[in-house]
């Protein structure tokens, strides 16, 4: 089977590695010549191989769709880790040409556009928002929901994710933070409004509000607050199923939230200054870790799961926690698992739609493949 990976930067490289390890022939395409040329150097495989079997550099972004069309007869799944501004057109092209498609997502308007078209004309499964948050944490929350489903109504679904410096390095700056992904994206998530489900009603809250203390089984005392993007369609999905409360929060070491909130709101620093604080003041992570927590409650029953991913000699924790989940789902898509399939889901038979949701992911197989990729090593 063949996987076409669009965008071979940090995340695309990790996706290519994962798909190769899952037994796929991997074709990598990028519009950035430097990224494509550096890709083989980013992953030190034991046998000297590169993480993708073929590389193509497209100098003109408008030629991306031509490249996809050229490979469409041999490709079993297309995985996009392209920037937001390139994703929509590429996804529409894949849908119109009957290709299985998935992406890291994160932009609500772009994902809505892709899914709306897929509902109208898709002939193969389409799955957006499949990174870490949104992505893995939402799948984990669905696992909890389905574990407790039946009898009385589920009341609360809480999702939390933290990309953190390794604890041994967590006191190197006052914010107790390091950059493991886009600082611009981080600032947007802190500043943008968020949607939550509260007492059965969808509400809008400010990013960085809702500060609470969290006792992690793996990392001890942390804090959490609302940030945008990570919930994806889980809020609306849980409301439709009668859940009272559902939210997504970001996890940080204690003290981070109050300090950043002071800089953003009280000092009213502009984005350029905030970017400089994060990049130059905190710096990029030498060693990082990602913690993923999902908690589901009903009556006196609680389902809670924590996952901890650490960086290794090959990838950062953020790369593994973002790229390995989408690769796992993409491998199932490529194998035809979601094609015209009826499964027993939440107590009854259900034909899987072509626009897939987190509830459609088979949790046992998903978790098994994550372990095959060595996500916890």
Model-derived regions: residue spans:
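Conserved N-terminal Rossmann-fold NAD(P)-binding element of oxidoreductases
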Residues: 3-7
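Hydrophobic/small residue at the entry helix of a nucleotide-binding pocket
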Residues: 11
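Conserved Rossmann-fold cofactor-binding substructure of NAD(P)-dependent oxidoreductases
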Residues: 59-72
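ADP-ribose/adenylate-binding Rossmann-like module
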Residues: 83, 93-111
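C-terminal catalytic/substrate-binding lobe primarily of soluble NAD(P)-dependent oxidoreductases
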Residues: 147-377
